[in-house]
Amino acid sequence: MWNEFKKFAFKGNVIDLAVGVVIGAAFGKIVSSLVKDIITPLLGMVLGGVDFTDLKITFGKSSIMYGNFIQTIFDFLIIAAAIFMFVKVFNKLTSKREEEKEEEIPEPTKEEELLGEIRDLLKQQNSSKDRA
């Protein structure tokens, strides 16, 4: 059972996934900072000094902090756009590699052509013997 777990845990895909999760978490922090510290203040300046984090609806002692929700939506949209662009570039690169592989199929050499002809002749001889 331990050996099976080691095979699973140290497979390339699992390690790649773990690295992706760690990088994704770090990327999420960067995007959150970008939205919170740069984009939201710029939007606030354009919209007349509005600070999105201060936007709220108060009911007695309770508040609905919809400004934070708007900021989280910006986070999501930027992360989604970045992932979309990454996947688009990745797909374009992999499709180019596949096209190059298809183009790289070499023409058969004279030896290969002759071997193919010999194979075909042997098949004909064997099939004519089977008929007789």
From Swiss-Prot:
SUPFAM superfamilies: Gated mechanosensitive channel. It is a multi-pass membrane protein. GO terms for molecular function: mechanosensitive monoatomic ion channel activity. It comes from the Bacteria. One of its GO terms (cellular component) is plasma membrane. Keywords: Cell membrane, Ion channel, Ion transport, Membrane, Transmembrane, Transmembrane helix, Transport. It is found in: Cell membrane. InterPro entries: Mechanosensitive_channel_CS, MS_channel, MSC/AndL, MscL_channel. Belongs to the MscL family. NCBIfam families: mscL, PRK00567.1-4, PRK13955.1. Channel that opens in response to stretch forces in the membrane lipid bilayer. May participate in the regulation of osmotic pressure changes within the cell. Homopentamer. This is Large-conductance mechanosensitive channel. The gene is mscL.
